[in-house]
Amino acid sequence: RAAAGLPGGTGHLVGGRQTARMSEPTESSEATAFDLIGGEPAVRGLVDRFYDLMDLEPDYAALRAVHGATLDSARDKLFWFLCGWMGGPQHYVERFGHPRLRARHLPFPIGIRERDQWLACMSQAMREREIDPTLAERLAQAFFGTADWMRNKGG
């Protein structure tokens, strides 16, 4: 569901939900989201800006409160995950195995407020990193499906 419309996307099922993970590029395939965004340097820049905003902006306080005292581990894990999710190197899987996103997020209270703050923070990071607007919109749609699936509390 979420992968539909992403460039080069075939989709990938994670925990029963389709995500934007792309297939590896071939000579005949379209570029992946990983390619279109600019590879590892661009993904790292996006992740770093996302967590910088989470730390700085009061609008993301509820989201920040769900995280630990420091964001270093979260930065690395999201970077590793997004690289593979967008069709690049599978750094996360190589280190930790299958993402099991919902299971890994169950210990953290995630409701509509946290979901919406995550999405707003990522959208702001994509704008500030000047991600192509068409790609950013497609990623935002895929992020919504995954973020909504992470909810484990009301409100």
What are these regions (language model features)?
Residues 23-31, 44-127, 133, 140, ...:
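Heme-based O2/NO sensor domains and their adjacent alpha-helical segments
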Residues 143-155:
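Short amphipathic alpha-helical segments at helix boundaries and their inter-helical linkers
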Residues 1-17:
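Compositionally biased, low-complexity flexible segments
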Residues 36, 106-108, 151:
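A short, structure-level motif marking secondary-structure boundaries and short turns
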Residues 35-43:
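Long, hydrophobic N-terminal alpha-helical segment
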